[in-house]
Amino acid sequence: MVNKVVAENRKARFNYEIIDTYEAGIVLMGTEVKSLREGKANIAESYASDEGGEIWLINSYLPEYLQANRFNHEPRRRRKLLLSGREIHRLRSAINREGMTLIPLKIYFNDRGRAKMELALAKGKKLHDKRESEKERDWNRQKSRLLKAHG
């Protein structure tokens, strides 16, 4: 069960406090799947939003597939995310009531070859929270160096 990660949002865990994660399918066109397989997608500035009872991925970048001609896709188009009705209801209530956001963490191909997205329900970190997590990361790094040196 090897998942091939093709795009990752590395700053998400630094900028947001991750509350819960979900696996969502993505509605893609054929050229978008081929472009994803090349591994040049970018989801760093993207987010997901609830519109009309559906969850949509906004501002993600999948470059045009160069071998396709006139049937190519729009690189920054909105893409529908596939979740169960119960998950959509839970996400909608959390977004509307508690002021949380939906952040994509990574896009990958599962063992059946389907494009999936790991979506996080998150709350934005304040500046002092970011500093605190940076201090903690530095301390863990120093600790591992000391243990390795005196090991």
UniProtKB/Swiss-Prot annotation:
Q: Name one GO cellular component term.
A: cytosol
- Main location group: cytoplasm
For this protein, the record's SUPFAM superfamilies field holds: Small protein B (SmpB)
Spell out the Basic and acidic residues composition-biased ranges: 129-141
Basic residues bias spans? 142-151
User: Which key words are in the record?
Assistant: Cytoplasm, RNA-binding
Q: What is its subcellular localisation? A: Cytoplasm
UniProt-recorded name of the protein? SsrA-binding protein
Identify the stretch(es) annotated as Disordered: 124-151
What family does the Swiss-Prot or TrEMBL record give for this protein? Belongs to the SmpB family.
Q: Name one GO biological process term.
A: trans-translation
The organism's superkingdom is given as Bacteria
Disulphide-bonded residues: none
Q: What does this protein do?
A: Required for rescue of stalled ribosomes mediated by trans-translation. Binds to transfer-messenger RNA (tmRNA), required for stable association of tmRNA with ribosomes. tmRNA and SmpB together mimic tRNA shape, replacing the anticodon stem-loop with SmpB. tmRNA is encoded by the ssrA gene; the 2 termini fold to resemble tRNA(Ala) and it encodes a 'tag peptide', a short internal open reading frame. During trans-translation Ala-aminoacylated tmRNA acts like a tRNA, entering the A-site of stalled ribosomes, displacing the stalled mRNA.
Q: One MF term in GO for this entry?
A: RNA binding
Gene3D superfamilies, sorted: 2.40.280.10
